[in-house]
Amino acid sequence: MAKLLKFSDESRAALERGMNALADAVRVTIGPRGRNVVLEKSFGAPDIVNDGDTIAKEIDLEDPFENIGAKLIQQVASKTKDKAGDGTTTATVLAQAMVEEGLRNTAAGASPIELRRGMEKAVALIVKGLGERSQSVSGDAIRQVATVSAGGDDEVGRMVAEAMDKVTVDGVITVEESKSLATELEVTEGMAFDRGYSSPYFVTDGDRQICEFENALLLLTDRKISAVADLVPVLETVQKTGSPLVILAEEVDGEALATLVVNKNRGVLQVAAVRAPSFGERRKAALADIAILTGGTVISEDRAMTLDKVTLEDLGRARRITISKEETTIVASEDSRDAVAERVASIRRELENSDSEYDREKLNERIAKLAGGVAVIKVGAPTETELKNRKLRIEDALNATRAAVEEGIVAGGGSTLIQLAGSLDGLANQLHGDQRTGVEIVHRALSAPLRQIAINAGANGDVVVEQVQRSGQGFNALTGGYENLLEAGILDAAKVVRLGLQDAVSIASLLITTEVVVADKPEPPAAPAPGGDPMGGMGGMGGMGGMGMPGMM
């Protein structure tokens, strides 16, 4: 494909236009009085959302150079979301402010490399200050963090705190759509383990990059599956039931994995493969735990069982299974409660008789996974559009709360960044030239989140920033007043603030040091076919050869 090139200031200007287009769409959502963004969908009703990462993913610009700038800022949102689960809008606003200041200085002749060095030194100092200011979180602070992350929705904050109280902070909490209008919390049997899907082609939700099945069957085995012949009988049996199938095995690869992917993508069977957790004897124990939870049987070489003799009675059953790239969560039915209790009692007896510290640790982990259960927040709303938006808010609140438990909390509303900005004055005095300018770029950018929160609340952003700097208090966007935000319960997770700042500087420093941009030349639109048929008469799509699975392909 032919390429287009832009150089020097022209290239950076194009990237900045693209960045601003995306950032301006995202920044209106920040704060408790942030606005919504309407996203047109190819099918169905449009989505009305308030989530920065979701908005960023939807934006594609017509100009290829501007689109590259937009995609660079998209990376800020997605990286922050992946690592912290929240703070995407803050990271985007910070990155935009740093890029604008950085490009203004490079256009005036500053060295991009020296600017970057100064910016990195400034961020290192701010991160250190965040660590010193952060406070551990417990009790009502968990509810407050969740409430702030959910845009001031106190019901969401209360529900997240209640879920964490019931299954502990380390427990499994999932979010699903309710069949009623009410949002409810339910604690059920279930477990999660750190293994994801064997192939990304099993994904059923492209936006969240997860595979999710309701009322699924589970095939549990400690064998490695490579030959498709081993799976043909059970696949044909499951296909007749119409239920999804999840295969937990030592490994599924080769011809077997390829066949599962093809059948899933053709819509023949809802299926996914996951590597069984742990290793060796501990893997067998983990599979046995999952079998108890789901009412299934482990197809094991130790018991001389073969895959081609598997029946429906051997398969486990789960109310819902969610599989991400790195984790699998199984929500079981209520029928397994007694069996799980017996299994936990058995493991406790084994724990009492164990002298090995390592073995005791692993046994305690198994007990926690089985006994802890899964808290399910069932989200209800009058319309599908509102339901999707509310579900995103709850997921953000959950992620922010987990981040707060990890690294503590700081005052929210952008006030902590403003207060830490003062610590950069000493660093700036130690540096000279463009490195000092880099520190000043970060100093000015740190006020951008608070300024935008104030603007979204209908206040004058510059006046609010000046008042917060002078008074040392924070701006409460809900009331329009100034107060101690820690005491008011307006809190941010320190991890979210830290990652948002670090990711913003990372992308901003890359963008201001760019000298050449290479983009694909857009393909000209195809001319309509002659003869009056705009489709040109599509030829038949030749059938794909079977893969040795009668009745499946």
Swiss-Prot record:
Subcellular localization: Cytoplasm
Record region (Disordered): 521-542
Top-rank taxon? Bacteria
Q: Which InterPro entries match?
A: Chaperonin_Cpn60_CS, Cpn60/GroEL, Cpn60/GroEL/TCP-1, GroEL-like_apical_dom_sf, GROEL-like_equatorial_sf, TCP-1-like_intermed_sf
What does the record give as EC number? 5.6.1.7
According to its UniProt record, which reaction does this protein catalyse? ATP + H2O + a folded polypeptide = ADP + phosphate + an unfolded polypeptide
Q: What is this protein called?
A: Chaperonin GroEL 1
